[in-house]
């Protein structure tokens, strides 16, 4: 059991924990669909969310590549809502989505207030499986980067959560021991169990 009096550093996941990925993704898809003149049914996001989560779990287990994830999550969603679209258009949507996602930077309600409270008491850090450049822009454009001493992503660490290597990389970067650290995230397996395996 962790003795919270000994905690000096708090590590956060970014997407779905601080950064409201679902809201920002919906706004981005709406923009992309409009730009491409696609009349996609309004239930797209309802089906995209669980499909996206499924593929992120496979990516974390190294069963698929990030490139495959970007295509498959869209292809499966379009099939689920019975919307006909070519593979070429799916690839274009996937590319435009990544390019435009950081135009929207909503965080969860209360996130800034919590970080303001914590920043004077602890060293704060990010551990994310998201792509380096995209995550960097999310932090910058949402004005979150001011709160974090270090940012570890899977590209830098050479491993994705729940792999112990990404947590060890983050701890080394922060120069802190596991017993003085706390991990906060939305995914029990990737964030919490992964951190407990250190």
Residue map of PLM features:
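Structural motif
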Residues: 197-198
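N-terminal helical cap/lid subdomain that shapes the substrate entry/recognition surface
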Residues: 4-109
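Substrate-recognition element of Asp-dependent hydrolases with the DxDx(T/V) motif
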Residues: 92-96, 100-106, 111-142, 148-154, ...
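Glycine-rich phosphate-binding loop signature in dinucleotide/nucleotide-binding domains
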Residues: 2-5, 120-122, 173-180
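Short acidic capping loops at alpha-helix termini that bridge into adjacent secondary structure
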Residues: 86, 146-150, 177-182
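Conserved Lys-Pro-Asp/Glu-containing loop-to-beta segment of HAD-superfamily phosphomonoesterases
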Residues: 160-192
């Amino acid at each position: 059991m962790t003795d919270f009096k000994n905690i000096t550093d708090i590590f956060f996941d970014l997407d779905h924990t601080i950064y409201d990925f679902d809201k920002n993704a919906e706004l981005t898809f709406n923009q992309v669909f409009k730009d491409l003149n696609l009349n996609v049914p309004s239930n797209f996001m309802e089906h995209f969310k669980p499909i996206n989560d499924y593929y992120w779990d496979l990516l974390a287990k190294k069963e698929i590549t990030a490139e495959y994830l970007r295509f498959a999550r869209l292809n499966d969603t379009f099939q689920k809502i019975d919307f006909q679209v070519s593979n070429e258009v799916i690839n274009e949507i996937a590319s435009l989505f990544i390019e435009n996602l950081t135009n929207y930077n909503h965080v969860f309600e209360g996130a800034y207030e919590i970080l303001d409270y914590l920043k004077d008491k602890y060293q704060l850090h990010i551990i994310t499986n998201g792509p380096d450049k995209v995550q960097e822009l999310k932090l910058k454009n949402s004005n979150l980067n001011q709160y974090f001493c270090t940012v570890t992503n899977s590209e830098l660490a050479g491993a994705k959560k729940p792999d112990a290597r990404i947590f060890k990389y983050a701890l080394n970067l922060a120069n802190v021991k596991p017993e003085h650290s706390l991990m906060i995230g939305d995914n029990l397996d990737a964030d919490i169990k992964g951190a407990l395996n250190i």
